[in-house]
Amino acid sequence: MASQFCLPLAPRLSPLKPLKSHFTDFQVGICVAIQRSDKRIHLAVVTEINRENSWVTVEWVEKGVKKGKKIELETVLLLNPALASLEHQRSRRPLRPVSVVPSTAIGDQRTATKWIAMIPHRNETPSGDSQTLMIPSNPCLMKRKKSPCLREIEKLQKQREKRRRLQLEIRARRALDINTGNPNFETMRMIEEYRRRLDSSKMSSLEPPEDHRICVCVRKRPLNQRETTMKDLDIITIPSHNVVMVHESKQKVDLTRYLENQTFCFDHAFDDKASNELVYQFTARPLVESIFRKGMATCFAYGQTGSGKTHTMGGAFLGKAQDCSKGIYALVAQDVFLLLKTPAYEKLELKVYGTFFEIYGGKVYDLLNWKKKLQVLEDGNQQVQVVGLQEQEVSCVEEVLNLVELGNSCRTSGQTSVNAHSSRSHAVFQLILKAGGKLHGKFSLVDLAGNERGADTAKATRKRQLEGAEINKSLLALKECIRALGKNKSHTPFRASKLTQVLRDSFIGQNSYTCMIATISPGMTSCENTLNTLRYANRVKELALEARPYHHCVSPPGHEVPLMIENDNTNSGKSLQRDEVIQIPTVEKEEEKESDELTSKKEPAASWSRSNQWWEAIQETAEGVNGDVDFCIAQSLSVLEQKIGVLTDIQKKLQSLREDLQKKSQVE
């Protein structure tokens, strides 16, 4: 064990005093205090002194292992100031002993004061046993300088801690905001960032809409299992009770992604958490009482196939079975029978009848009579009648649900690229009120077939393509009828489709009320179809705003452009042809006395006007689902070739006329 021989405490070193002069105080074998990299201070034996480079080598034993290191002289003097001067050793002050108890690790003695170097009786390596070190009563406080190695270690440690903090922040942000396994990671991040900046309002603050003839609502469904498996993104945001936003992902020329946010405004917008009861409260429920006042109400669901139309109208699906008790069919029936029992309408002695039929391929079939084919005719009073349609009297909600289940079991369905059980027909369920055998009011609930793009059915069978064409044709006709209803036009083009023909009484008259529920899919893969649905519904909403100018709404950017394309193509074509025919005689009249060649232009014009009937003939041939499309295409190409020849002849004669006019102007 080392002896308790103490060296006197030296005064504070002057920075100008050369360090090499202090090597006279050092000798191999003395015991000095050193500081480890983990801030521990303990004793070690000097084994080597390098006077040229000003460093010493020390050794010590720790846990039975002999260790050593090189230390700068300045660092040793900071911890052992007694070695600074021999003269101060002679005049040292009395010291008081302090006992330091070693820790579990040998050589691990910690103290807040400075250590005083000691010289042992013999040259032995400190083993870390219990030692009593003499510390001055008034210790000299000196600033210890860290070695370059220690400073570099501390610098690296700070950088490491900073990197770890940044990584933890990034991981926490990713865990809260986005799923890093999503292939559309960047798009999801931009959508979430945009949503955080929006001020959303709760659906509970909704109030029932005021009475009006047209009501347009939008309902968003949640992501289904297939979309979740494909890691599809939800690109639909409903920030308030009447605003729908679509975040369309696009790509710049430099391949960077960005969002194009399109905003639509409607009477009401329902998010994916809204129930059928909530949707019914603000859509069909305000129209129920109108049929007791001799009104004709219509509520139809429109949207892409697989967007939730049948779920909204009929109820939720449990596998392949449908729970019809929570659909709009059942909710309307409940309110109808409740109003029948009120004193105001009980005295009318009204009876309720139910009908259920579908429109498939331009033909009408009775779903309550084994899909019997029906005829749609007009009677002497110009009222549309569905000949042979079976009407069954109902007295409670259960009987209505039985009719709905029977009709749904017979309804035409098929498989598409989006939905394995897609409805391929328009289903119309009607609740009719009669008083004394005469019609009193009628509520038509229409579950429309899903609208489809031609690009989606390009690889489908011919039958499926013809179905989609007929569906889109009837939906366009329905839009034109709603336009006429919103503008209070005297003429309604209901004859353009069987759907609008059977619903004629819902579009004509002051007691007609219409409610549209546009269902949309939230997935990014359905973005194009969703935008088409919202544009269709927004057009209906714009028409409703013309009838109710006091209601303000935010229209989507660029919505004026589709209105310019809304004109009928046939009428536009006819007006263009008429202008071309008129321009030629006008030029003839002006230049009749100057050139005799212009008289021959009347022949192409007459040929053009005689062929104006070609499109009508082709339409008659292609009318209906069973039309021969190949024959119509061949006939159209033949007529177009003839017209191209006529136009080429006119072009040559106009060029000749221009040349003659130029020559005449040069002569003058």
Curated annotation (Swiss-Prot):
Pfam families: KIF2A-like_1st (PF22923), Kinesin (PF00225). It is found in: Cytoplasm, Cytoskeleton, Microtubule organizing center, Centrosome; Cytoplasm, Cytoskeleton, Spindle; Chromosome, Centromere, Kinetochore. Residues 585-605 are annotated as: Disordered. InterPro entries: KIF2A-like_N (IPR054473), Kinesin-like_fam (IPR027640), Kinesin_motor_CS (IPR019821), Kinesin_motor_dom (IPR001752), Kinesin_motor_dom_sf (IPR036961), P-loop_NTPase (IPR027417). The keyword DNA repair does not apply. ATP binds at G303, Q304, T305, G306, S307, G308, K309, T310. One of its GO terms (biological process) is microtubule-based movement. Residues 213-543 form the Kinesin motor domain. Residues 585-604 have a biased composition (Basic and acidic residues). Residues 149-177, 646-667 form a coiled coil. One of its GO terms (cellular component) is spindle. The modification Phosphoserine is found at S204. GO terms for molecular function: ATP binding; microtubule binding; microtubule motor activity. Phosphorylation at Thr-125 by PLK1 is required for activity in the correction of kinetochore-microtubules attachment errors, while phosphorylation at Ser-204 also by PLK1 is required for the kinetochore localization and activity in prometaphase. Keywords: ATP-binding, Cell cycle, Cell division, Centromere, Chromosome, Coiled coil, Cytoplasm, Cytoskeleton, Kinetochore, Microtubule, Mitosis, Motor protein, Nucleotide-binding, Phosphoprotein. Its main location: cytoplasm. It comes from the Eukaryota. Belongs to the TRAFAC class myosin-kinesin ATPase superfamily. Kinesin family. MCAK/KIF2 subfamily. Plus end-directed microtubule-dependent motor required for spindle assembly and chromosome movement during mitosis. Has microtubule depolymerization activity. Plays a role in chromosome congression. This is Kinesin-like protein KIF2B. It comes from Mus musculus. The gene is Kif2b.
